[in-house]
């Protein structure tokens, strides 16, 4: 047996391949990071976006192993994200909130600085699917995705409709494969 500790993503019990030989990690262990200055300062803040993400992951047979709430400030977002990326039990991170076009919406910028590789197709597909629901207003979202320290990270708007759309239609169908791809070099 190796002296190297086994982390959840490298555990052979959680790694498999699909019919096409694609690496998969399942069940997934996700972290949810809600970005909202108003909610972060409230004593009993509700978190509909985070609750929606957690519910959808659990309904799909996955686990949410961490939930965090942070103000829409670059340094605060990056500190909490860094903690989540350092947590060996976290396979992927989904953030909600702070993706709009106002000066206060800094999630894509703060998280994007942590990306080793961007996943531009995520934002492109999200905006395409959003267009079908909300029309041209989709241009105001800066939803994005990428790989940070071998961990897929998705940056979603705060709207529960947007969270549901992105999680059901894009993230859940692809996350097990993305986690497998992002961590394959750790087990080869």
What are these regions (language model features)?
Residues 1-31, 64, 182-188:
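Haloarchaeal acidic low-complexity proteome signature biased toward cell-envelope/secretome components but also
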Residues 17-19, 78-81, 139-142:
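A generic local structural motif
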Residues 18-72, 76:
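Glycine-rich phosphate/diphosphate-binding loop of Rossmann-like nucleotide-binding domains
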Residues 27-28, 88-90, 148-151:
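Short coil/turn connectors at secondary-structure junctions
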Residues 33-34, 95-96, 155-157:
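Short beta-strand segments
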Residues 44-48, 79, 106, 165-166:
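Generic recognition of short, well-ordered alpha-helical segments
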Residues 58, 64-115:
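N-terminal small/polar loop signature for handling phosphorylated ligands or for N-terminal nucleophile
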Residues 102, 106-188:
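Proline/glycine-rich low-complexity loops and linkers
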